Amino acid sequence: MAYRDQPLGELALSIPRASALFRQYDMDYCCGGKQTLARAAARHDVDIDIIEAQLAQLAEQPIEKDWRAVPLADIIDHIVVRYHDRHREQLPELILQATKVERVHADKPNVPRGLTKYLTALHEELSSHMMKEEQILFPMIKQGMGRQATGPISVMEIEHDEAGELVDVIKHVTQNVTPPPEACTTWKAMYNGINEMIDDLMEHISLENNVLFPRALAGE
């Protein structure tokens, strides 16, 4: 099957582990989920035939859960427990680790300078964002008022883009979250945690941008 003309967001939802493949190629399937596979491949200089073949192989596996068919209230409950609560645990710990690494390894050329600042900014951004979703937008959607939520949803999508921009900066200062040879145990553990946080955040944003919000606006 040809996947090149399909949006990344749709492919991430319909093919098991496609999201992990896109992350491997640094393709944005959450905030940039509306771009086609062909466009994303061209932007990242990826051979379209190779990635199509990889997707075809992944598509042979059964999908764990098709969120496009799950009731919106259940999706919201899942987002809060699986992603919101997790981000609230992840980011404070990563900030502590970054503070230590930047202090202890200040004289190393590969130290991720500014990482603490950018993780703190992301933590503040997401804390405010998630609170607004939980207190305003999610109750509206659960009450069947999705059609009236155009304004709040637009704001949330803009904030998703802003979070994505901060993630790009974090990836830049960490050499795409790759520890240098001299990295200590804390440094390596922090980068593992950052990679996990980015994976979670991309899945989180994708589920909202590509499933929850469109279905809510359609009046479900």
From Swiss-Prot:
Gene Ontology annotations of biological process type: protein repair; response to nitrosative stress; response to oxidative stress
Keyword field contains Secreted: no
Keywords: Cytoplasm, Iron, Metal-binding, Stress response
Domain of life: Bacteria
Molecular function, one GO term: metal ion binding
Subcellular location, record wording: Cytoplasm
A Pfam family reported for this protein in Swiss-Prot or TrEMBL: ScdA_N
Gene Ontology CC annotation, any one: cytoplasm
Family: Belongs to the RIC family. YtfE subfamily.
Cross-referenced PANTHER family: IRON-SULFUR CLUSTER REPAIR PROTEIN YTFE (PTHR36438:SF1)
Function: Di-iron-containing protein involved in the repair of iron-sulfur clusters damaged by oxidative and nitrosative stress conditions.
Subunit structure: Homodimer.
Protein name: Iron-sulfur cluster repair protein YtfE
Organism per entry: Salmonella schwarzengrund (strain CVM19633)
